[in-house]
Amino acid sequence: PFGERSPAPIASHSSRRALELSERLAARGAKMYGAWWCSHCAGQKETLGAEAMGEGGFYVECSPDGAGAENERCVAAGVKGYPTWEVGGQLFPGEKDLSELDEMLSSAK
């Protein structure tokens, strides 16, 4: 629909490690809250790659003018900035490299 904005397509392909992390994130019901205009969100998506992001199903668009926006969900979760990961009800703000995503999964309840 008119007025909805989408993030840039993800250019990178997922490494084996990124795909494994994506499976673990999905199994834990993880969510990545972000916005179409957020450069760090784009960086986070590139770190995981197109396949991991596409299969994971954990991206939540928080910008009200973004395609498929779920702004109310972001507000309800208490998201203050982007990107913010949610795992086990805990929020983990900021862009993460693969090692940090692994640590996040290990430390989440």
Summary of predicted features, one role per range:
Residues 14-56:
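Local sequence-structure signature of Cys/Sec-based thiol-disulfide redox active-site neighborhoods
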Residues 81-109:
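Non-catalytic, surface beta->alpha helical segment in thiol-disulfide oxidoreductase systems
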Residues 51, 76-80:
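Extracellular/periplasmic catalytic domains that process cell-envelope and extracellular macromolecules
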Residues 44-47, 68, 80:
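Secreted/processed peptides and extracellular or luminal domains of membrane proteins
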Residues 8-11, 61-63:
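Short, flexible loop segments at the rims of nucleotide/cofactor-binding pockets, characterized by
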Residues 64-73:
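Structural microenvironment flanking redox-active thiols in thiol-disulfide oxidoreductases
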Residues 1-7:
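N-terminal targeting signals for export/organelle localization
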Residues 31-34, 58-60, 84-86, 91:
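Structural recognition of the beta-strand scaffold that forms the well-ordered cores
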